[in-house]
Amino acid sequence: MYKMQLLYCIALTLVLVANSAPTPSSPTKETQQQLEQLMLDLRLLLNGVNNYENPKLSRMLTFKFYMPKKATELKHLQCLAEELKLLEEVLYLDQSKNLHLTDIKELMSNINVTLLKLKGSEASFKCEYDDETVTITEFLNKWITFCQSIFSTLT
């Protein structure tokens, strides 16, 4: 009699676990959505920087950023993550009508979260940077292009 109750309890537990488990989405689809979000956030930053009314653009262009030698895989997003602090500091120079401090903080937070999801939490990848530096607009454009190329390989 107890065996039957035990089997019933186990079966009920399995049903509950199976029904409450999240349905797995396609890793490729999830990666595509995260890349789209990253591209959107980078474009918003780029639009704020490139705003023709931005009086501090010439000053912002004096700051130099490093790009990886060959960025071809998601693991190369570690290189973007390493440059984010400098990017954020430079963006704080430009608190214009189109790019407020709260917007910068929110976008940078979104980018950090998305990068963590895309590259994972392991920071074992060591970036190899180009010797030449780029401006803030080139930096953002190149990372947007990188995301587009990775996205196209996933479709």
From Swiss-Prot:
Family matches, as PROSITE patterns = INTERLEUKIN_2
Residues of the signal peptide: 1-20
UniProt name for this protein:
Interleukin-2
Protein family per UniProt? Belongs to the IL-2 family.
Glycosylated residues: list them: 23
- Purpose of the protein: Cytokine produced by activated CD4-positive helper T-cells and to a lesser extend activated CD8-positive T-cells and natural killer (NK) cells that plays pivotal roles in the immune response and tolerance. Binds to a receptor complex composed of either the high-affinity trimeric IL-2R (IL2RA/CD25, IL2RB/CD122 and IL2RG/CD132) or the low-affinity dimeric IL-2R (IL2RB and IL2RG). Interaction with the receptor leads to oligomerization and conformation changes in the IL-2R subunits resulting in downstream signaling starting with phosphorylation of JAK1 and JAK3.
Disulphide connectivity of cysteines:
79-127
A Pfam family per the record: IL2
Q: Which UniProt keywords apply?
A: Adaptive immunity, Cytokine, Disulfide bond, Glycoprotein, Growth factor, Immunity, Secreted, Signal
- UniProt lineage: Eukaryota, Metazoa, Chordata, Craniata, Vertebrata
